[in-house]
UniProtKB/Swiss-Prot annotation:
Name of the protein in its database record: Isoleucine--tRNA ligase
Motif annotated as 'KMSKS' region, chain positions: 589-593
Species whose genome carries this gene: Chlamydia trachomatis serovar L2 (strain ATCC VR-902B / DSM 19102 / 434/Bu)
Domain of life: Bacteria
Name of encoding gene: ileS
A GO biological process held by the record: isoleucyl-tRNA aminoacylation
Description of its domains: IleRS has two distinct active sites: one for aminoacylation and one for editing. The misactivated valine is translocated from the active site to the editing site, which sterically excludes the correctly activated isoleucine. The single editing site contains two valyl binding pockets, one specific for each substrate (Val-AMP or Val-tRNA(Ile)).
Cell compartment(s), UniProt: Cytoplasm
Record's GO cellular component terms: cytoplasm
Primary localization: cytoplasm
Cofactor: Zn(2+)
Length: 1036
């Protein structure tokens, strides 16, 4: 494709964008549906602190398609855009830009100053977002945007929190949660699941000495830094453990029996002492590894606990427990009254209790700790292990699990409501419902919602010195209790507000909400519910539709579900489309640093937004699978789908204007069979599109477009060209124009939600004076049942299948399509052969074959060969496969032909019989000399390849027509221009020209031919003969 094509595509789309804006078409689509049923849509809010990428464009396209379709299908579809303004993404940008990276730096800079800096950069890339949203062809209402940092939004978040609190679903507690030491704050469990990486970590087995010199317990860990906080060991009471003596060291070890070969593979290296049960070990004491917390022994530390979660598939069957740094450890130690110590600060550095490593980052201390254990003869094994480990989704630093005091939403209390809500949600693809999302709900944990950060919605809890709580649910309530006017709810406006009540002083707790709490409250907060627009909010809840990426099954989809189920015992949305991830072409994550992908702007400038949209919509990424992005794939959509459609429109316009066709004057025209077929295909496609859209299956909706455009351009128009070119104003010509006009108009409306630019371009060139101003103001078409003719579609499908089969034979055996052949034999069921007999001439034209023979039996020129399909049959019959192979080899042609018709056969193996079907058999053909054969799903084609002199001469004539018309196109001649030709060619080509002169002149609009004896003009190879032409336009 040349640059001119690319420029025209981009320029044409820009022109359409201008038309939409100048005529305010989006607003008119809303006005047009005022009073119609509302289709409610929630838009997942992005952060404007980063530029949009392909993932955003993909999700935006999906949302746009569904909303456009709903609007055209008779719904009022408001599309408010929203911005996620709070949280770590914004804070992190400000910290980097201001160099506030040291602990306490933000406090020294001032929380008020810091938050105002955050406010300044929130919309850093808002203009870029608006550009890309517009350029991809997405319609949203930027004039009514909602923002999570707005006073009204934050007040509704307070109302949500207060409502949860009133239901007893909020509590304060200490739990082990994912913790980002880079941010100094806990994360939710679903945030921790968003960024796992394969990493190499230490792998150590440590020797814990039982009291009274009774040997050592061996425990394995990949986090040596937690060993300084060891408070207990755990065994499975039902597992069998062993005591052995290491011959080299003389030490006695206890470990799980099944893990023994893992750590002592050489049976001669140890002496067996005996077995003991896990239960017998429970309660025994051991010596602390480190001296830092040995005083905790009096409080119940350094004992062996029972734990039924222990497995012997890895490790030693004995688990080291640091209750401050492992959830299972925490609960086990809590149950058995083992104390908790947490000598790690919020930056991940050891505190003063661990005097030998104080101030050192815990992950950096792994080597020093292992070295010390080795020096003290407490290290049994040291190595590395490769495993998946969670990293902070924002800072890309390793997370730890840490016991922190936090505020929680009691998700586990409403788990049954969440599971019930999920049952009523329609998921696309469907497996997400009970798979990734359903399983996540089943394992849902209480949600740690408090963050010790700065730029966010403050948690509205005021606490007195004696622990009494005031939970505020509105600005009015806070103003009444504090006596102050509230103009902003951010920390630096309300942290100093003190409430005095009943002789007590209450101050706000120093936390803000997890920003996912903001987005989960979006259905209510976007409308300032319940303070304003309550009726509107309730009428549009749950949303009819949402869409985001697969990662949001543990993000926004989840938080929406938690809050909606808890507050209203309902889902937050009825239908959801989940998309996959767009990767670079090499399969890696798209990376600006690696520069491994083309920019979206470059792609849209080069190939257009429609090509990008259709490329994405017709890929696996809309089925929640990963897509390796390819700019060649986008280019292919443009060249193979959109340009042929544009060419079809140009063809219609050219000849409709040439002959003055008026679409209003088409009543009572008798249609040809091919007209009825393309209309039937159109309305069948329309029915499939409507059905697919009702199921929110965009891939199924757009996939047939490609085949239909192929049917339209490469079959209907190509097969009907002579009808359009008919100089007489015949009924047949008017039928062709009428049919093509209807197809293009209806199809422009069908594709409008999916590829809005080309559909608008088509519609504008076709619409009448009284038609709606834009294709997007039209109703989505309805199926015209009387125009759907299934038998005709099947018949044409059979013809196309046969033609494709014949062409594949020609290609395989290097027989040019322009070279006529004498015979083709089509073999199929008698019923189908009889139905196709009347279209033999059509098949002959397409295959360039003189005589088409329809047969229910394979002709004598071909022998059908069958043998077992070893891949499928081997699984069924095993070692009897050779017997079946011999039996098939001996079958007569009559039985083989019967199998070809029925698709089944019974093979005798001695006294036993085995039934075989088509998938068990591989079919091939042995052809007589001069014949070739091939099969499709329904037919066998046998092609007679023998060339006679008349066939050779006609083949040369057809090649001449092709080359002359190529020169016409290259010379920019109009379709109606007449030409004169000067020809230099060998005798055989001159003879072919003379023999088929009338045909050649008619096909090329040639009025005269002069044979010259010298080379002039462009030279061509015509079936092995060098020929040159000069073309000159002849004035009429």
């Amino acid at each position: 494709m040349d640059n001119e094509d690319k420029i025209s595509i981009s320029a044409k789309e820009e022109k359409i964008l201008s038309f939409w804006k100048e005529q305010d078409i989006f607003q008119k689509t809303l006005d047009n549906r005022e009073g119609c049923p509302t289709f409610s849509f929630y838009d997942g809010p992005p952060f404007a602190t980063g530029l949009p990428h392909y993932g955003h464009l993909l999700a935006g396209t999906i949302k746009d398609v569904v909303c456009r379709y709903a609007s055209m299908d008779g719904h009022y579809v408001p599309r408010r855009f929203g911005w996620d303004c709070h949280g770590v993404p914004v804070e992190y940008e400000v910290e980097k830009s201001l160099g506030l990276t040291e602990p306490g730096a933000i406090e020294r800079f001032g929380v008020a100053n810091f938050n105002e800096e955050c406010r300044k950069i929130v919309f850093r890339y808002a203009d870029e977002w608006k550009y890309f949203v517009d350029r991809i062809g997405r319609w949203v209402d930027f004039s009514a945007t909602w923002r999570t940092m707005d006073l009204s939004f934050m007040e509704s978040v307070w109302w949500v929190f207060r409502s949860l609190y009133d239901q007893g679903l909020v509590y304060e507690g200490t739990k082990v949660v994912p913790f980002s030491t880079k941010l100094g704050t806990p994360l939710s469990n679903f945030e921790a699941g968003q960024n796992y990486k394969e990493v190499d970590d230490p792998s150590v087995v440590v020797k814990f000495a039982l009291q009274d010199n009774q040997g050592f317990l061996l425990a394995w860990t990949t986090t040596p830094w937690t060993l300084v906080s060891n408070m207990a060991l755990a065994v499975h009471p039902e597992l069998t453990y062993v005591r052995i003596k290491d011959k080299e060291s003389g030490d006695e070890y206890i470990l799980g029996q099944e893990s023994l070969p893992r750590w002592f593979p050489d049976r001669e290296s140890y002496e067996w002492i005996g077995q003991l049960s896990g239960k017998s070990l429970v309660g025994q004491s051991y010596e602390p590894l480190f001296p830092y917390f040995q005083d905790k022994k009096e409080l119940g530390a350094f004992r062996i606990l029972p734990a039924d979660f222990i497995e012997e598939s890895e490790g030693t069957g004995i688990v080291h427990m640091a209750p401050a740094f492992g959830e299972a450890d925490f609960f086990a130690c809590q149950e058995h009254n083992v104390p908790l110590v947490c000598p790690v600060d919020n930056q991940g550095c050891y505190t003063a209790e661990v005097k030998d490593f104080v101030g050192e980052y815990i992950k950096s201390a792994d080597k020093g700790i292992a070295r010390r254990l080795k020096n003290e003869n407490k290290l049994f094994y040291q190595g590395t292990v490769r495993h998946r480990y969670p990293f902070c989704w924002r800072t890309d630093s390793p997370l730890i699990y840490k016991a922190v005091n936090s505020w929680f939403v009691a998700v586990e209390k409403v788990k049954s409501k969440m599971l019930k809500a999920n049952e009523s949600i329609h998921w696309t693809p469907g497996h997400i419902k009970q798979g990734r999302f359903g399983k996540w709900l089943e394992g849902a944990r209480d949600w740690a919602i408090s963050r010790n950060r700065y730029w966010g919605t403050p948690i509205p809890i005021w606490r007195s010195d004696d622990g009494e709580l005031l939970v505020i649910g509105s600005i009015q309530e806070l103003e009444a209790l504090s006596g102050q006017k509230i103009v902003d709810l951010h920390r630096h406006f309300i942290d100093e507000i003190e409430i005095n009540q009943n002789g007590k002083s209450f101050r706000r707790i120093p936390y803000v909400f997890d920003c996912w709490f903001d987005s989960g409250a979006m259905p209510y907060a976007q409308n300032h519910y319940p303070f304003e627009r309550a009726e509107e909010t309730e009428a549009c809840f749950p949303a009819d539709f949402i869409a985001e990426g697969l990662d949001q099954t543990r993000g926004w989809f989840y938080t929406l579900t938690v809050i909606a189920a808890a507050l209203f015992d309902q889902p937050a949305f009825k239908n959801v489309i989940v998309n996959g991830i767009i990767l670079a072409e090499d399969g890696n994550k798209m990376s600006k640093r690696l520069n491994n992908y083309p920019s979206p702007k470059m792609i849209m400038d080069a190939y257009g937004a429609d090509a990008l949209r259709l490329y994405l919509l017709n890929s696996v990424v809309v089925k929640a699978e990963d897509l390796r992005f390819s700019d060649k794939g986008v280019e292919s959509v443009l060249k193979q789908v959109l340009l042929p459609l544009s060419n079809a429109l140009a063809f219609y316009k050219t000849y409709a204007e040439l002959y003055g066709f008026d679409p209003k004057e088409t009543d009572n025209i008798e249609l040809a069979e091919i007209d009825r077929w393309i209309l039937s295909s159109l309305y069948s496609l329309l029915g499939k599109t409507r059905e697919s859209m009702s199921q929110y299956d965009l891939h199924a909706a757009v996939n047939p477009f490609v085949d239909f455009i192929e049917d339209l351009t490469n079959w209907y128009i190509r097969r009907s060209r002579r009808r359009f070119w008919d100089a007489e104003d015949s009924t047949d010509r008017r039928a062709a124009f009428s049919t093509l006009y209807e197809v293009l108009v209806v199809f422009s409306k069908v594709i409008a939600p999916f590829i809005p630019f080309i559909s608008e371009d088509m519609y504008q060139q076709l619409r009448g004076e009284t038609d709606p101003e834009s294709v997007h103001l039209c109703d989505f078409p309805h199926v015209v049942l009387e125009k759907i003719l299934p038998n005709l579609e099947r018949k044409m499908q059979d013809i196309r299948e046969i033609v494709a089969l014949g062409h594949s034979l020609r290609k395989e055996h290097k027989l040019k399509v322009r070279q006529p052949l004498q015979n083709v034999y089509i073999v199929g069921s008698q019923e189908r052969m009889e139905a196709l007999a009347q279209v033999g001439s059509l098949i002959g034209e397409e295959l360039n074959v003189k005589d088409v023979h329809f047969c229910s039996e394979t002709p004598e020129y071909v022998t059908t060969l069958i043998k077992p399909n070893f891949r499928t049959l081997g699984k069924k019959v095993g070692n009897r496969l050779p017997e079946i192979q011999r039996a098939l080899a001996g079958l007569p042609q009559e039985q083989i032909q019967a199998f070809m018709h029925k698709g089944q056969m019974v093979v005798s193996l001695g006294e036993e019989t085995i039934s075989l079907d088509k998938e068990d058999i591989t079919v091939s053909w042995a052809s007589a000399e001069g014949f070739v054969a091939r099969s499709s799903a329904s037919f066998v084609a046998v092609l007679d390849c023998q060339l006679t002199e008349p066939l050779i001469m006609e083949g040369i004539a057809r090649e001449l027509v092709n080359k002359i018309n190529t020169m016409r196109r290259n010379g920019k001649l109009h379709v109606s221009d007449r030409i004169a030709i000067r020809l230099h060619a060998p005798v055989i080509v001159q003879e072919a020209f003379a023999l088929h002169k009338e045909y050649i002149c008619e096909e090329t609009l040639t009025t005269s031919v002069s044979v010259i004896d010298y080379k002039e003009g462009e030279e061509w190879d015509i079936n092995g003969h060098a020929v040159s032409f000069v073309l000159e336009r002849v004035e009429r």
